[in-house]
């Protein structure tokens, strides 16, 4: 007996790095709270990301969901794996009687979406784009879906004719719980909390430059610094020694489970400009110096950082200019003007869409109600 549309599981297709996975986790938590059944389709890389939300969720690892690579041989292997992934996803979607598919970009969302077009054409597909530049997987699939949910109205590279809806970028429940936490800039005395985030894969340049920059600050400032820094496991010992050499207290780890509290406690954040980091800074409202990843596809991290900079919610230093001297001068200047930090915190908070996860969940539930309509009935814009 076939299930009613509203009782069918919602398929979340996400994996790879935290930038794709964390918004998916936030949506899953909200949909579970609403009593919906969730199934995760992902790649092998997501196994390294800690998630209590998906701990009791059916999880299917699909071949072809992590096909990045270079070279003719690798490309051929990727095409074969992708084909297997599409076939497997299509069969799973039919067996599970999926109600809706929500993809979060990156290669892990390709097999389920193409599988749906092959074997489950009546299943509505929603894609979410976290960055200010539409990712290549989402660009490839955009014309095959019911709705494209955007984090920013100004997102570029959206194909003409795509039905779009601005929902914002969902953040994890722990981040949302601290939305709009009041900010007090550091005074002339007391501890200065500095948080350095390198993304879910770490960022060696931050481990190289930040300790050297702080060592250039006057001793009176250094002795007030309390640094919490995310860095690769293999870098921890040398970074710890660098901070110890200049008398700075530092907590170092490859990954922090309490990142929401760390952001809320920070006077200043130095970070990559991944979509989740930008969304988390805006949700809580904290000033940040952004260092975009120079090799990011389509330079999307620079576009993300530009959103924050244009709103006067932070500052950007491109990696070629990210030297100890440049960073030390910027930090010293900001600490000398606490009002500037406070203004940036307020401006960052104005960017935050605190109801992003509710907006996206509403869109998903609406798709269940309109699944039989050939074009759906979303109240989004058609991109011209």
UniProtKB/Swiss-Prot annotation:
InterPro entries: GlcNAc_MurG, Glyco_trans_28_C, GlycoTrans_28_N. Pathway: Cell wall biogenesis; peptidoglycan biosynthesis. Its EC number is 2.4.1.227. The keyword Membrane applies. UDP-N-acetyl-alpha-D-glucosamine binds at residues 17-19, 131, 172, 200, 301. It is a peripheral membrane protein. Keywords: Cell cycle, Cell division, Cell inner membrane, Cell membrane, Cell shape, Cell wall biogenesis/degradation, Glycosyltransferase, Membrane, Peptidoglycan synthesis, Transferase. SUPFAM superfamilies: UDP-Glycosyltransferase/glycogen phosphorylase (SSF53756). GO terms for molecular function: UDP-N-acetyl-D-glucosamine:N-acetylmuramoyl-L-alanyl-D-glutamyl-meso-2,6-diaminopimelyl-D-alanyl-D-alanine-diphosphoundecaprenol 4-beta-N-acetylglucosaminlytransferase activity; undecaprenyldiphospho-muramoylpentapeptide beta-N-acetylglucosaminyltransferase activity. It is found in: Cell inner membrane. It catalyses: di-trans,octa-cis-undecaprenyl diphospho-N-acetyl-alpha-D-muramoyl-L-alanyl-D-glutamyl-meso-2,6-diaminopimeloyl-D-alanyl-D-alanine + UDP-N-acetyl-alpha-D-glucosamine = di-trans,octa-cis-undecaprenyl diphospho-[N-acetyl-alpha-D-glucosaminyl-(1->4)]-N-acetyl-alpha-D-muramoyl-L-alanyl-D-glutamyl-meso-2,6-diaminopimeloyl-D-alanyl-D-alanine + UDP + H(+). It is an enzyme of class 2 (transferase). One of its GO terms (biological process) is carbohydrate metabolic process. Its main location: membrane. Belongs to the glycosyltransferase 28 family. MurG subfamily. Cell wall formation. Catalyzes the transfer of a GlcNAc subunit on undecaprenyl-pyrophosphoryl-MurNAc-pentapeptide (lipid intermediate I) to form undecaprenyl-pyrophosphoryl-MurNAc-(pentapeptide)GlcNAc (lipid intermediate II). This is UDP-N-acetylglucosamine--N-acetylmuramyl-(pentapeptide) pyrophosphoryl-undecaprenol N-acetylglucosamine transferase.
């Amino acid at each position: 007996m076939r299930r009613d549309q509203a009782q069918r599981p919602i398929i979340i297709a996400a994996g790879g790095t935290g930038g794709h996975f964390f918004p998916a986790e936030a949506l899953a938590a909200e949909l579970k709270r609403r009593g919906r059944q969730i199934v995760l389709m992902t790649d092998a890389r997501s196994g390294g990301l800690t998630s209590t939300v998906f701990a009791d969720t059916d999880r299917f690892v699909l071949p072809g969901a992590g096909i990045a690579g270079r070279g003719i041989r690798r490309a051929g292997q990727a095409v074969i794996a992708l084909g297997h992934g599409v076939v497997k996803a299509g069969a799973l979607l039919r067996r599970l009687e999926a109600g809706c598919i929500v993809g979060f970009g990156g290669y892990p969302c390709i097999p389920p979406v193409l599988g749906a077009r092959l074997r489950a054409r009546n299943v509505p597909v929603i894609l979410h784009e976290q960055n200010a530049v539409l990712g290549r997987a989402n660009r490839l699939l955009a014309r095959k879906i019911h709705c494209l949910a955007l984090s920013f109205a100004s997102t570029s590279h959206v194909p003409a004719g795509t039905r779009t809806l601005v929902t914002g970028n969902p953040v994890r429940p722990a981040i949302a719980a601290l939305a709009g936490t009041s900010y007090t800039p550091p005074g002339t005395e007391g501890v200065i909390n500095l948080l350095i985030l390198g993304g879910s894969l770490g960022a060696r340049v931050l481990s190289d430059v930040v300790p050297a920059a702080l060592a250039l600050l006057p001793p009176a400032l250094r002795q007030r610094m309390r640094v919490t820094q995310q860095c690769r496991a293999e870098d921890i010992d040398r970074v710890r020694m660098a901070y110890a050499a200049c008398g700075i207290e530092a907590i170092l780890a490859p990954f922090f489970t309490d990142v929401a509290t760390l952001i809320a406690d920070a006077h200043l954040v130095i970070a990559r400009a991944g979509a989740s980091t930008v969304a988390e800074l805006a949700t809580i409202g904290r000033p940040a110096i952004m260092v975009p990843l120079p090799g990011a596809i389509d330079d999307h991290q620079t576009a993300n950082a530009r959103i924050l900079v244009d709103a006067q919610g932070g500052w950007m230093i491109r990696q070629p200019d990210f030297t100890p001297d440049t960073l030390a001068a910027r930090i010293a200047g900001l600490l000398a003007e606490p009002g500037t930090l406070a203004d940036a915190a307020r401006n960052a908070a104005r960017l935050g869409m605190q109801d992003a996860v509710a907006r996206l969940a509403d869109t998903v539930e609406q798709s269940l109600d309109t699944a039989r309509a050939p074009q759906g009935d979303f109240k989004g814009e058609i991109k011209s």
